[in-house]
Swiss-Prot record:
Pfam family, one: YtpI
Topological type in the membrane: Multi-pass membrane protein
Organismal lineage: Bacteria, Bacillati, Bacillota, Bacilli, Bacillales
Organism in which the protein naturally occurs: Bacillus subtilis (strain 168)
InterPro entries: YtpI
Transmembrane segments: 1-21, 54-74
Protein name as annotated: Uncharacterized membrane protein YtpI
Main location: membrane
Location of this chain's protein in the cell: Cell membrane
């Protein structure tokens, strides 16, 4: 259970880090990449929280709510990953063009 608490805290730190980095970023593609990374971090936070609740408490309501959190968190992390994979090559081309 301590591992899940550590992962929840780490996910929260990454979420805040990428949100702040996204606000401070100048190019729009860099903002989109930071937004995608923060979406992955928030999704993992919700997923780990749901998993932690399911392990700690064994009532039917907790299992249902934990399952919902796991599904929502996994969906958010997956959507963030897909967005990151979409924007990363575009950002690399833009950076290559700017430095050439």
């Amino acid at each position: 259970m301590l591992v899940l608490v550590f992962l929840i805290g780490l996910s929260a730190c990454f979420y805040v880090y990428y949100k702040v980095k996204g606000v401070r970023a100048k190019p729009s593609l860099a903002k989109e990449i930071c937004s995608a990374k923060s979406s992955m971090a928030l999704g993992s936070l919700v997923l780990f929280y749901g998993l932690n609740q399911m392990i700690l408490f064994h009532s039917v309501l907790t299992l249902v709510i934990g399952g919902i959190f796991i599904v929502i968190g996994a969906g958010s992390a997956w959507a963030g990953y897909k967005a990151f994979r979409h924007y990363n090559p575009l950002h690399a081309k833009e950076a290559e063009r700017d430095h050439a």
